[in-house]
């Protein structure tokens, strides 16, 4: 982080930046963490193939914190897993390597060559260390030789740092110097510290550890050094021994270990304990090591009940925790003594690394090891069986000691496990610890000559004995302390024991506390907790219990007994510290045992004295309340009822976290009670609705996006299931609230113009759902009866009974097919049993709902009748907004929900109100558009709407339905025999969004709530769209259970368990294959609110949701689905026929029908636009009149033929045309723009201003485009489990947890590379193809063998080639060795494996007939279940180089200068010798075509409209090229051409993370973006540019920066999160430009993000890097460089070396100084080098999201985009306005000369006289004294000998042409060629085609200066850490900033952010946002005496609380002026 401190009022003011915690005490409060956690966080470097979840880790990764100095692992590896036994997938060893690029941080180690240690971060989810080491190559041996302080390999194993940390823990708890953690200490513990001191600072040792770890040295004394050193050998030997393990059970255990470590981290992540971070460090040690039981693995998500199995011998488990045989212990002790010296000095070689290459496996522990384990199939099966039994036994007692576990180990299992044999039977606490100790012993014995292979047969026995011995050491200390705790009567001894117990637990984890006697210690601590008279004992006892739950997560099952005692401390508070500690413990307990707390009355107790606690304790109390509400049942409502008023009042609190916990509490209550109307009314009785309504409209918003969604959804549920609450909300003016949320603050009374505020699709969906539920339900008969068919067939939804299974908390869950398959698999693996039950389905009887309906009318409908004014106000307020949301949304979910809401409004509004409301909306054209949709739901809804409108307003709509094409479309539907039978290839979204396959699944989706006959009228909002926030949402739940058993705080259970069946209800699609696995995966696609499910889900948004609750809803058979679809089609056909018959058959449709008048006029005028006859301009005038004066509809424009005819009229250039094209365009401009008639141009300057008719034409054409286009949108949205994971993050989770199975095969055509014999591999679907190449090449598969070499079996299959690994690491563009094929298709290297398989595999081709992206966004199940064959063969020499994905060299080749070509040489000869220059190209020529341009390959019904709009835009932009003297301006601003519908689709597409990760952008989007960029606004094209131009990590980073809510869920754990490498360089400010050139030379073309630090300054990261680009931009403007035209100026506020330096300035932007033919080559070379550097700098800035501060002119950007051929004299004004004005006068003389010469009346004498009389301001041309040299550059001749040629009236035209050409082209050609060459060495220039020249300044330099208003600042800036928006200082600041002028703004921005300019979008786009925090001082200090300081890395402004606004203004300006160009410590 970069700090710019200003602490001294008058002293030198410095800016500082820093990232290490140790030197930044002032900011600990800012980070919200204590010192220890900061130091740990800054040292936590994410492992490349893992993700860090911590805050510090994230900042370090993103902002380039100082921890980036630590080196990364050496080479990247694809995420590949061996799967030798596909049939037994759960038992397969799977080792994961994550994909990344060839170089970069994301690569896990193949051969770790690391010189500095790295600690595994607290939140990193590591794989098993055994697996890491097994894959580690031999050269790692040398690492220990360097010093006794082990520099652990960062990529391979975390064991060394673990040992170092273990030694820390040993020192803390004991003074013994033994290097083995098992040694107990007789010495006393460290002196205890108070809680305050613990919170205030870390332990000395921990601080020291953190600091020294950074320095790369060990933290402890000699003995710990020896420990660290010897641990290196132990870890390696452990890995070697493990290489012979049996593969099947081992793999399962390794995976579990990883998952459980995740669970531990997530559990402790939110704990407020001050020692959490040090614990986190310890926890990372156990990642992947722990063996743990299946049931507890699933506890956190599936909550399986405890099994009812027992094993012989398990009864004595608890009593056998004594140390093992004393003989072995003594031997080990003596062995340790004798080898102590040896271990202190590094061994010459690590014997543990000696392995047979045959033992190595490709990324697996032992999956393909050729050395057998000695077990046959029978033995392995027995081992697996025994392991399962042990697993299930572990379920029953997670706290048993290690010795007990070892005694349970069956004999048969031991033989299969080698050295780690006991792993399968021991608890997670000791397994890894013991394995590594065993490895250490093995290493020591090998060092003494013991053959390592002896450990194979003897390993299991040795390890069992060894585990007993080692485990006893850890538990003996606890046993001693336990005796102290139980010393009744001796309170001092009990206190001492409690203090020591705290210390033991605070530094321990499951590894170091193996065998800890939880069941004995907890009762003793509970006893101490009840000693009311002794505060210290109670405090330490409660702390110990808290620490125990952090260190040993499973102990919470025992600590739950302490709940009553904890609650006692809250009922009567004697000691506030004890009460707050009790709350901390209860909060941890509530994550898994909330039911126990609730039933003990804990919810009320926690809230009893809420206001007396500190803010952290209050947050804990509210978190407990929220967790208690998670699974509350109606029977338990009384536990929470009394607390509701307090919770309701809490919603008005200032603290954001408290408010969010309270909201979560109510959301869960409403969710659980949604079918209990009386309870919902009680929950909402105490001002809840009012308070939440106020909460929603707070500005700036208090709620995060996820919580906002949850709260709005809660309202929807309440309105849906309790209509009287909807009535209450309507009376509370909820309509205005909703309008505010969708449109922002209203501007006065103008409600006609509706501008939606930016909202995510999920937010829009919930808001429209709420509007829908506020209106009464639609009826169930008549035209709405079909809605029931749009859901699943009712036969499947009305089962009389449902089956349920019970979890550990006693909750019953619906048991459906997916559950069945998953749980069967779990049962098979674990032997788990669980209770099930059968119960009646309350919604089975379809008549029930009907009776309810008869009994009571909907309260909402009553309100509509009783209070029509309120209803009218509601409808008028929201109808227009809803309509706008529908029009501007691309996602089908939102559109369906809007359609339902609009249908409800139209149905219940009376005719007069409807007429008023619909007056300003083109409803008819929208209905016509919907009727042409491919989506059945849209078609049905539009027919229903048309019917209602015709019933209510027949007079109005009988005309409009004809004119807008509704009648035409309905007739088509009525007449179509085969409706929607064969879908088009491209399915479409929006108005036409569903193909038949889509419908197939849509109709089977249990998604609609329109089933009137099934239950209450508003039965559950969440079922009708799978976008629910429920953890029970099937996909996320299944995946969590199956793959990611995190055991931390549960995600909010926001939807009921009944929602579990949603995926099941969404059914197998008819194309699903029959294998169980594939049908399971096929049904994993919940077609949710993004693309499909919601199409079925939301259109029928009537609130009855039976299918969701029916639990056992069956999957309908294919016939049923097809039958339903056919019924719907039949209904549509029938309804359309009735509609036509009823409303349109009675009239005779002839020419007299008034509805056809406009169409007939338009057809007549269009026919006259004939190219073969001259019909004058009358037809154009008629068209202009119709378009601009009448309300001509899109339908009429389409059907009149106007589009096609006008396109031909403007583009045809045939010789047969009677009028030339230019003439026709001028006529068009005359009619539509007011230009003169051709041939009658006036003599003066042409500057027409009337653009009305052309603007109207463009708008009509855009409407046609919106109605006709059918572009598909590929979105991958899944039900969001917790309200946070929106927009595809659930789909990312799917990719996170699934892999593709590929069989690598050598291509049949080649025999000169090795054949892959490793069996199928599992590959990360988002890995790139080049990752497979890297994987194979570093193992020797890329080496071409000589003919005489042996066969494939050379014993080195798995050997990693170190040189190749290093080559991949060091070179970003390594030469490709292998190429890959699927079938006959050659795969591009930069394509993802998923995309390759989906696009090219045979299965994919077969399936493409029956599926598409819309129906199965994740692909058919076959993609995930079948094995895909990928062929590889070596790259031929002639092919090498052309296949590379990197664009650097290719770009250079394309832009190589062509001066040497004969044609070019001839042209230059003519220029120099004869003064002949090329004519200026007319840019219009490239656009005036009537066929699609080269860049367009898609086909769409709207193609002609697109081409016409492209022509109209080019005419608007370049019309002045057709005239001699026209003003250079656009007729219509480009913004008027933006198409809102296409923009919505593009934005929706670009917000889908999965599309970006897979590179699966639709072709229409990229092609339209380049050929018709005017359809999209700049920010959309900017995002499209970043997605297509760079690597996917940059694209993903850009997406996360612009859409932070995507990152709110678990993307830190995601292996698809962006991993951008960062490279740091140190720069000397005195040689800035020189060193910048050097840096760009070295790193310009690197994919790594460049980060800058300055010499003698500590700052690094975002701020200094931003400043680097700004300062280099400034340096490039120095006058002495001679690069630019302009005037020399000095800076107004120079700093350092800037004083006395002159800079170039031009009011219109900088442009290159021209070269003449005689310029010295040395000078040219120097200038060219600078321009080449400028090109690299600009490209690198764009690539790294940095901003330059370089004001370049428009002609410069035209050169960038290769538009130089069309640069003309019009552009001179943007270079030198003075010269441009003079040339304009001279051009006027030329025009006068031409008119005189054309005048036939002149004789030769009078002609000569008239020409000589021409003058400029009274001065003749000859008298001007001009010659043929360039104005302002007398040394540059315009042609050879030009300085001797005077300018006369006769050669004036040649002179002007040459001046323009030399200024804009010839004189600057070499500079721009060098510039392009430099630019293209970074990335190709053609990617900039998305932008216009005038937009490149925004792309490069950000937004231009604009006024800052207080409102914008309030919305975009974030007060924090001491300030709120109401704080005086914040209000002062906004007022001061809003008064700044442009220069002051630049100074302030450079001070705070490092760059003097904001990104496009201003403060809204600043990332991170500007945060104002309070700068604190001692009580004796006056804030007015201090200056503000900043942290540029995170854009923090640390602002003192000044006493007046004048003082603040003064101090801010001083700081901004003086605090530049330095980054030092605060």
Swiss-Prot record:
CDD domains: HECTc. Pathway: Protein modification; protein ubiquitination. Residues 379-391, 1056-1065 have a biased composition (Basic and acidic residues). Residues 1040-1053 have a biased composition (Basic residues). It is an enzyme of class 2 (transferase). SUPFAM superfamilies: ARM repeat (SSF48371), Hect, E3 ligase catalytic domain (SSF56204), WWE domain (SSF117839). Residues 1-10, 32-42, 73-84, 359-371, 392-404, 1094-1104 have a biased composition (Polar residues). Gene3D superfamilies: Hect, E3 ligase catalytic domain, Hect, E3 ligase catalytic domains, Leucine-rich Repeat Variant. Residues 789-876 form the WWE domain. It catalyses: S-ubiquitinyl-[E2 ubiquitin-conjugating enzyme]-L-cysteine + [acceptor protein]-L-lysine = [E2 ubiquitin-conjugating enzyme]-L-cysteine + N(6)-ubiquitinyl-[acceptor protein]-L-lysine. Residues 1-437, 1008-1123, 1441-1470 are annotated as: Disordered. Its EC number is 2.3.2.26. Residues 1919-2026 form the HECT domain. One of its GO terms (biological process) is DNA repair. Residues 1530-1604 are annotated as: K-box. The active site is at residue 1993. It is found in: Nucleus, Nucleoplasm. Residues 94-112, 135-161, 171-188, 199-241, 412-430, 1068-1079 have a biased composition (Low complexity). Keywords: DNA damage, DNA repair, Nucleus, Phosphoprotein, Transferase, Ubl conjugation pathway. InterPro entries: ARM-like, ARM-type_fold, HECT_dom, Hect_E3_ubiquitin_ligase, HECTD1/TRIP12-like, WWE_dom, WWE_dom_sf. GO terms for cellular component: nuclear speck; nucleoplasm. One of its GO terms (molecular function) is ubiquitin protein ligase activity. Belongs to the UPL family. K-HECT subfamily. E3 ubiquitin-protein ligase involved in ubiquitin fusion degradation (UFD) pathway and regulation of DNA repair. Part of the ubiquitin fusion degradation (UFD) pathway, a process that mediates ubiquitination of protein at their N-terminus, regardless of the presence of lysine residues in target proteins. This is E3 ubiquitin-protein ligase TRIP12. It comes from Danio rerio (Zebrafish).
């Amino acid at each position: 982080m970069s700090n710019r401190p200003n602490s001294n009022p008058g002293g030198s003011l410095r800016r500082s930046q820093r990232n290490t915690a140790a030197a930044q005490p002032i900011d600990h409060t800012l980070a919200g963490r204590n010192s220890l956690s900061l130091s740990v966080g800054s040292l936590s470097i994410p492992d490349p193939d893992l993700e860090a979840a911590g805050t510090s880790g994230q900042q370090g990764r993103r902002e380039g914190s100082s921890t980036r100095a630590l080196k990364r692992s050496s080479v990247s590896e694809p995420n590949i897993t061996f799967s030798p036994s596909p049939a037994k997938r759960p038992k397969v060893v799977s080792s994961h390597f994550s994909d990344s690029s060839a170089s970069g941080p994301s690569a896990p180690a193949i051969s770790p060559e690391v010189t500095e240690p790295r600690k595994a971060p607290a939140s990193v989810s590591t794989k098993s260390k055994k697996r890491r080491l097994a894959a580690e190559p031999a050269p790692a041996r040398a690492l220990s030789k360097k010093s006794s302080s082990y520099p652990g390999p960062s990529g391979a194993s975390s064991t060394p740092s673990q040992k170092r940390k273990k030694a820390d823990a040993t020192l803390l708890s004991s003074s013994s110097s033994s290097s083995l953690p098992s040694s107990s200490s007789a010495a006393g513990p460290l002196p205890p510290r108070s809680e305050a001191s613990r919170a205030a600072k870390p332990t000395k040792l921990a601080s020291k550890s953190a600091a020294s770890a950074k320095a790369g040295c060990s933290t402890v004394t000699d003995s710990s050094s020896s420990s660290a050193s010897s641990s290196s050998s132990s870890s390696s030997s452990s890995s070697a021994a493990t290489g012979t393990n049996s593969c099947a059970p081992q793999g399962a255990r390794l995976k579990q270990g990883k998952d459980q470590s995740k669970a531990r981290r997530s559990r402790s992540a939110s704990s407020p304990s001050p020692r959490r971070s040090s614990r986190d460090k310890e926890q990372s040690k156990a990642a992947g090591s722990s063996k743990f039981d299946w049931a507890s693995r699933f506890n956190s998500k599936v909550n399986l009940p405890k099994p009812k199995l027992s094993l012989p011998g398990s009864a004595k488990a608890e009593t056998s925790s004594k140390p093992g045989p004393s003989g072995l212990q003594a031997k080990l002790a003596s062995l340790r003594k004798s080898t102590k010296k040896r271990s202190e000095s590094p061994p010459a070689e690590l014997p543990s690394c000696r392995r047979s290459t045959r033992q190595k496996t490709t990324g697996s522990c032992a999956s393909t090891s050729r050395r057998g384990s000695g077990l046959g199939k029978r033995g392995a099966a027995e081992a697996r069986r025994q392991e399962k039994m042990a697993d299930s036994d572990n379920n029953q007692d997670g706290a048993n000691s290690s010795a007990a576990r070892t005694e349970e180990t069956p004999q048969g299992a031991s033989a299969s496990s080698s050295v780690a044999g006991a792993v399968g039977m021991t608890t997670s606490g000791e397994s890894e610890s013991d394995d590594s100790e065993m490895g250490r012993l093995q290493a020591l014995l090998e060092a003494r000559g013991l053959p390592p292979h002896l450990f194979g047969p003897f390993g299991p026995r040795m390890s069992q004995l060894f585990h007993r011995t080692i485990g006893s050491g850890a538990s003996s200390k606890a046993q001693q302390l336990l005796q102290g705790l139980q010393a009744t009567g001796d309170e001092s001894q009990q206190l001492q024991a409690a203090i020591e117990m705290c210390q033991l637990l605070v530094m321990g984890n499951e590894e170091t506390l193996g065998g800890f006697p939880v069941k004995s210690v907890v009762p003793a601590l509970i006893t101490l907790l009840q000693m009311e008279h002794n505060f210290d004992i109670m405090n330490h006892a409660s702390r110990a219990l808290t620490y125990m739950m952090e260190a040993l997560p499973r102990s919470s099952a025992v600590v739950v007994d302490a709940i009553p005692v904890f609650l006692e401390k809250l009922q009567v508070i004697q000691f506030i510290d004890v009460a707050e500690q009790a709350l901390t413990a209860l909060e941890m307990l509530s994550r898994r045992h909330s039911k126990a707390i609730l039933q003990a009355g804990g919810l009320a107790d926690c809230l009893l004295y809420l206001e007396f606690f500190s803010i952290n304790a209050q947050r804990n109390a509210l978190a407990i309340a929220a967790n208690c509400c998670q699974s509350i049942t109606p029977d338990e409502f009384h536990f929470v009822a009394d607390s509701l008023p307090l919770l309701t009042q809490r919603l008005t609190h200032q603290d954001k976290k408290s408010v969010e916990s309270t909201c979560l509490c109510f959301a869960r209550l409403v969710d659980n009670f949604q079918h209990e109307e009386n309870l919902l009314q009680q929950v909402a009785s105490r001002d809840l609705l009012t308070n939440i309504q106020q909460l929603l409209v707070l500005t700036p918003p208090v709620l995060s996006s996820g919580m906002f969604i949850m709260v709005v959804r809660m309202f929807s549920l309440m309105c849906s299931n309790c209509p009287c609450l909807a009535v209450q909300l309507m009376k509370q003016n909820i309509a205005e609230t909703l309008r505010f949320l969708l449109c922002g603050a209203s501007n006065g009374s103008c409600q006609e113009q509706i501008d939606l505020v930016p909202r995510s699709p999920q937010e829009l969906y919930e808001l429209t759902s709420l509007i829908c539920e506020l209106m009464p339900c639609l009826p169930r008969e008549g035209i709405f009866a079909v809605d029931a068919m749009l859901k699943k067939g009712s036969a499947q939804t009305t089962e009389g009974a449902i089956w349920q299974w019970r979890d550990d908390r006693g909750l019953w869950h619906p048991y459906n097919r997916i559950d069945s398959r998953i749980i069967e698999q779990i049962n098979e693996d674990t032997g788990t049993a669980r209770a099930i039950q059968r119960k009646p389905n309350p919604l089975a009887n379809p008549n029930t709902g009907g009776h309810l309906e008869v009994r009571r009318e909907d309260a909402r409908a009553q309100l509509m009748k009783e209070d029509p004014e309120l209803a009218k106000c509601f409808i008028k307020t929201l109808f227009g907004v809803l309509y706008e949301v529908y029009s501007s949304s691309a996602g089908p979910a939102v559109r369906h929900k809007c359609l339902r809401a609009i249908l409800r409004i139209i149905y219940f509004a009376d005719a007069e109100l409807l007429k008023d409301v619909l007056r300003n909306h083109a409803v008819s054209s929208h209905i016509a558009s919907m009727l042409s949709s491919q989506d059945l739901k849209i078609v049905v809804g539009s027919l229903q709407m048309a019917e209602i409108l015709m019933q209510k307003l027949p007079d109005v709509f009988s005309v409009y339905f004809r004119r807008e094409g509704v009648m035409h479309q309905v007739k088509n539907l009525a007449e179509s025999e085969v409706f929607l039978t064969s879908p088009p290839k491209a399915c479409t979204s929006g108005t036409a969004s569903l193909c038949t396959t889509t419908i197939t699944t849509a109709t089977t989706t249990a998604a609609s709530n329109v089933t009137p006959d099934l239950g209450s009228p508003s039965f559950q909002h969440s079922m009708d769209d799978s976008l629910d926030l429920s953890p029970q949402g099937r996909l996320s739940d299944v995946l969590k259970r199956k793959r990611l058993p995190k055991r931390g705080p549960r995600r909010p259970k926001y939807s009921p368990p009944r929602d579990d069946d949603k995926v099941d209800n969404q059914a197998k699609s008819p194309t699903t294959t029959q294998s169980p696995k594939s049908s399971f995966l096929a049904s994993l696609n919940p077609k949710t609110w993004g693309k499909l499910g919601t199409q079925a889900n939301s259109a029928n948004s009537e609130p009855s949701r039976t299918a969701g609750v029916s639990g056992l809803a069956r999957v309908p058979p294919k016939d049923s689905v097809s039958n339903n679809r056919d019924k719907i089609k039949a209904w549509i056909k029938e309804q359309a026929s009735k509609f036509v018959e009823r409303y349109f058959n009675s009239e005779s449709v002839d020419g007299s029908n008034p509805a056809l008048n406009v169409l007939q006029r338009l057809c007549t005028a269009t026919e006259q636009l004939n190219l073969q006859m001259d019909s004058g301009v009358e037809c154009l005038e008629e068209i202009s009149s119709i378009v601009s004066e009448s309300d001509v509809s899109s339908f009429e424009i389409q059907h009149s033929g106007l589009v096609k005819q006008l396109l031909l009229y403007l583009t045809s250039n045939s010789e047969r045309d009677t009028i030339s094209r230019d003439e026709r365009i001028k006529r068009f401009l005359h009619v539509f723009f007011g230009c003169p008639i051709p041939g009658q141009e006036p003599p003066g300057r042409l500057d027409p201003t009337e653009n009305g008719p052309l603007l109207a034409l463009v708008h009509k054409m855009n409407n046609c485009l919106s109605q006709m286009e059918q572009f598909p949108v590929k979105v991958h949205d899944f039900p969001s489990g917790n309200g946070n994971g929106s927009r595809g993050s659930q789909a990312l989770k799917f990719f996170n947890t699934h892999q593709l199975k590929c069989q690598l095969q050598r291509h049949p055509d080649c025999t000169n590379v090795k054949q892959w014999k490793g069996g199928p591999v599992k590959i990360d679907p988002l890995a790139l193809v080049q990752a497979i190449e890297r994987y194979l090449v570093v193992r020797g598969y890329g080496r071409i063998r000589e003919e005489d070499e042996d066969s494939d079996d050379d014993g080195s299959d798995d050997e990693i080639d170190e040189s190749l690994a290093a080559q991949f690491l060091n070179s970003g563009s390594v030469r490709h060795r292998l190429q890959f094929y699927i079938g006959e298709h050659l795969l591009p290297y930069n394509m993802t494996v998923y995309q390759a398989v989906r696009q090219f595999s045979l299965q994919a081709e077969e399936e493409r007939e029956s599926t598409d992206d819309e129906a199965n966004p994740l692909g058919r199940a076959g993609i995930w279940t079948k094995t895909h064959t990928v062929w590889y063969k070596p790259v031929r020499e002639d092919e090498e180089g052309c296949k590379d994905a990197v664009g650097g060299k290719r770009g250079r080749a394309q832009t190589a200068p062509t001066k040497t070509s004969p044609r070019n040489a001839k042209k230059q000869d003519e220029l120099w010798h004869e003064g002949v220059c090329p004519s200026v190209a007319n840019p219009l020529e490239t656009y005036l075509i009537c066929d699609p341009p080269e860049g367009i390959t898609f086909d769409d019904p709207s193609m002609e409209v697109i081409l016409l709009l492209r022509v109209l835009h080019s005419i608007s932009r370049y019309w002045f090229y057709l005239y001699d003297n026209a003003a250079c301006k656009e007729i219509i601003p480009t913004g008027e051409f933006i198409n809102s519908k296409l923009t919505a689709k593009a934005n929706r597409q670009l917000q889908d993370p999965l599309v970006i990760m897979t590179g699966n952008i639709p072709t229409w989007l990229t092609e339209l973006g380049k050929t018709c960029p005017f359809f999209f606004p700049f920010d959309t094209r900017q995002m499209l540019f970043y997605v297509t131009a760079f690597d996917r990590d940059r694209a993903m980073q850009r997406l996360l920066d612009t859409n932070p809510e995507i990152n709110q869920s678990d993307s830190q754990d995601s292996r698809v999160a962006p991993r951008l490498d960062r490279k740091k360089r140190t720069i000397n400010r005195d040689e800035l430009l020189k060193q910048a050139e050097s840096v760009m030379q070295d790193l310009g073309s690197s994919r790594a993000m460049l980060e800058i630090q300055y010499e003698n300054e500590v700052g690094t990261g975002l701020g200094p890097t931003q400043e680097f680009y700004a300062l280099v931009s400034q340096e490039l403007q120095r006058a002495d460089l001679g690069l630019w035209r302009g005037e020399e100026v000095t800076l107004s506020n120079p700093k350092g070396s800037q004083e006395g330096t002159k800079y170039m300035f031009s009011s219109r932007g900088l442009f290159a100084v021209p070269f003449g033919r005689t310029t010295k080559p040395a000078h040219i070379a120097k200038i060219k080098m600078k321009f080449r550097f400028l090109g690299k700098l600009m490209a690198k800035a764009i690539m790294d999201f940095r901003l330059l501060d370089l004001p370049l002119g428009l002609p410069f950007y035209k050169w960038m985009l290769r538009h130089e051929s069309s640069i003309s004299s019009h552009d001179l004004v943007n270079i030198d306005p003075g010269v441009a004005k003079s040339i304009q006068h001279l051009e006027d003389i030329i025009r006068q000369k031409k008119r005189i010469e054309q005048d036939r009346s002149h004789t030769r004498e009078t002609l000569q006289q008239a020409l000589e009389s021409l003058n400029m301001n009274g001065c003749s041309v000859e008298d001007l004294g001009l010659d043929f040299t360039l104005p302002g550059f007398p040394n540059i001749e315009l042609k050879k000998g030009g300085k001797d040629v005077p300018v006369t009236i006769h050669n004036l035209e040649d002179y002007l042409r040459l001046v323009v050409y030399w200024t804009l082209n010839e004189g600057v050609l070499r500079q721009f060629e060098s510039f392009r060459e430099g630019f293209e060495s970074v990335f190709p220039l053609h990617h900039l085609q998305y932008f216009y020249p005038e937009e490149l300044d925004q792309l490069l330099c950000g937004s231009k200066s604009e006024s800052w208003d207080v409102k914008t600042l309030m919305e975009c800036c974030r007060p924090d850490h001491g300030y709120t928006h109401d704080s005086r200082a914040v209000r002062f600041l906004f007022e001061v900033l809003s008064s700044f002028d442009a220069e002051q703004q630049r100074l302030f921005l450079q001070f705070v952010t490092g760059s003097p300019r904001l990104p496009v979008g201003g403060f809204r786009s600043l990332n991170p946002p500007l945060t104002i925090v309070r700068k604190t001082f001692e009580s004796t200090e006056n804030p007015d005496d201090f200056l503000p300081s900043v942290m540029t890395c995170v854009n923090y402004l640390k602002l003192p609380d000044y006493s007046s606004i004048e003082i603040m203004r003064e101090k801010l300006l001083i700081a901004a002026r003086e605090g530049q160009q330095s980054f030092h410590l605060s």
